[in-house]
Structure formats: structure tokens, C-alpha cells
Amino acid sequence: MKSQSIMSVERSAETSLTLEIPTSPLIIKITQQERNILSNVGNLLVKAFGNYENPDYIASLHLHAFQLLPERITRILSQFGSDFSAEQYGAIVFQGLIEVDQDDLGPTPPNWQGADYGKLNKYGFICSLLHGAVPSKPVQYYAQRKGGGLLHAVIPDEKMAATQTGSGSKTDLFVHTEDAFLSNQADFLSFLYLRNEERVPSTLYSIRSHGKMNPVMKKLFEPIYQCPKDANYNDEDVANSGPTASVLYGNRELPFIRFDAAEQIFNENAGQTSEALGNLMDFWDEAKTLINSDYIPNSGDLIFVNNHLCAHGRSAFIAGQRIENGEIIKCERRQMLRMMSKTSLIHIRSVTRTDDPYFIMEEHLGKIFDLD
């Protein structure tokens, strides 16, 4: 007969081997005290540095993050930055991170080009501190808005309503990892919701939600897949087949992912071989059942994403209105702020501007923009 202590050890080992497959992001409810600290820190940094892109501020970002952020938030992000485990979903929702003064914010502009970044300055400091705690460094991409700064306002644009871009609204934005067509895509993303009065759900999909590696996923390690440039480019820019890459990469048991369903599967000009498209469709049949659309962000919520583990998107909506009790209610249009970051400037140096190591000039899977 086994002793009670031996049986206890066996049960413990059995429990530790049970994999808890993650199917949704971790939700962290920010306390009022933490919100107050973040607001005060944001105001302090505005006075000290003027702008979140101030080189002196960016150079000492990690120091500021660890000194000024509430300790609980710092610990969560620091652990998140190096957790690639089977249980890590790859996204965190910071619920009620900040309080947004809607009157001060004013009406949502018609598009991102009309954003008043003077009103967004404080939020830029707060977002950058979160990336700094990972630690990761905010960057900008010429492939997106020809740079456009370290913070991007994402606003529905009526002229782009039907597109698969952040400016779209009238169609579901398929889940995708940010800039899947780049070899040096962002490591981490933050999405700060200033307003979401249309009550648009955010969609998230994690490669970890599949559980253990399976035969369908193993085929995605083959470097045979087209990764077309996204809908922000003109048709003539994306029509020709480019270099190929794998969809899954990194560790063979706990992989990372580069994936854009809209461009790799449903884009008629993607140029996938029949083998590649068949593999992608088999994978999509599994992946689409694992998409999580349960969370509707409120004003002041922030979603922090590991771009190598978790893809993001959103449901279709009509900008500037929502339905309540069967009635159409007019409202302010959605407004969100996106920041992207890389953990190492050394590893991206071959694709950055000579005079700005935070500015990435990659056009397509290692190819650099030719601006001459």
C-alpha cells in the first residue's frame, strides 16, 4: 500500500502536468489609487519633458517606468514580457487604467489625420511607461503612415469604412498580428480606448488557445507562405508575389505566430500556392473557433498585447451610433490610441534610420524602402 505522502506527491505531479489552455486575456482591474498615481505621473512628465517623444525621456524610459509606475502594474508587465509559456494567452486588459475627460477630448475628428496630439500628450507618456516596464522601447514604422510618430490615433474614417484597416468600420476586421508582412514587426502593442460609445467588442486570438502542437500547425513552420502587404497599400503595391516565410516560428512546441487572415487567406492577390492555401484554410478552420470577442472596452481601458502570441481585430460597427432597446442612438465616434514597441534596438539596427534607431524602414520581409 502506498503511503499518504507518496500519493500526495503523485497527485501534485499530476496536477502540475495538467495544461490549462488559455482562451481569454487576463483582466486586471485598476484601483482608484493606481489611477490617481498614473494621472499624476502623466502630468509630471508633461511638465518635465514636454512631449513623450522627447529624446531625453525616451533614453531613460525604463528608469522612469520602474520608478514611477504603480508597483503592481510594473510587476505584471515585467513578468508578461518574458512569459512565453503554454498558459500565457498573450494579452492583458487593464480595466479602468485612466479616466478620460470627454469634454476636454472634444468631438472625434473625421480621421486620424485630424487628431489633436496636444490633447493626447499625457496619454502618450502613460502608454510609453507601460511599454518601458516590459521592458520594451516604443518605435515607429515607415510602413505605417510613413512613421506618424510613436503614438497613433485610430479613428473610423468614412472613406475607408469597408477596408481591412484600423480606419475601417463596416466590416469585421479579421484577426491579425500587427504588420505580419514585416520580419521586424512590433513585439508589443498597446491599445488605449479613449471612447468606445458604439460598444464595439475587441476580438483576440491566441496561438496558445490551440493547446498542444498538432499536425495542422506543424505545417505552418514551412517557409512557403506569402505574407502580403496590408490594405493600407495601393493595389499595385501588393499584387506581385513577394518573399515567403513561415506562419509559425520560434520554439517548435510553444511557437510564435505571424498571421493575417484577411491578407494571407482571403486576399485573391495573395499568390499562395495550392499547398500553402490548403494548409492555411485547415489552420483557419481551427483558429476561427478560438477567437475571443467577449470583451467590450470602456473609455480608459487599455489592452496590452504580445504581438508574437496574440492576434487582434474587431467586430463590424456603424461609426457614431449604437442600438439601445431597439433604437438607434447617436454617439461620439470611437477613438483609440495605439503604441508599438521592440525589446531590442540592436536586433533591428539593420532596418532603422541611421540617425534614428527607433524608426523602422522595413517595407516587406526584410526589404528596405527605397526612397531615393
Curated annotation (Swiss-Prot):
SUPFAM superfamilies for the chain: Clavaminate synthase-like (SSF51197)
Q: Which domain of life is it from?
A: Bacteria
Record keyword Metal-binding present:
yes
Cite the cofactor comment. Binds 1 Fe(2+) ion per subunit.
Protein's UniProt keywords contain Oxidoreductase: yes
Family matches, as Gene3D superfamilies? Clavaminate synthase-like
EC assignment: 1.14.11.-
The Swiss-Prot or TrEMBL record lists the needed cofactor(s) as:
Fe(2+)
The membrane-spanning stretches of this chain are none
Question: Where do the annotations place Fe cation binding?
Answer: H176, E178, H312
**Family statement drawn from the similarity comment of this UniProt entry:** Belongs to the clavaminate synthase family.
Q: What does this protein do?
A: Alpha-ketoglutarate-dependent dioxygenase that in vitro catalyzes the regio- and stereoselective hydroxylation of L-lysine, leading to (4R)-4-hydroxy-L-lysine.
Protein name as catalogued: L-lysine 4-hydroxylase
Q: Which organism is it from?
A: Flavobacterium sp. (strain CF136)
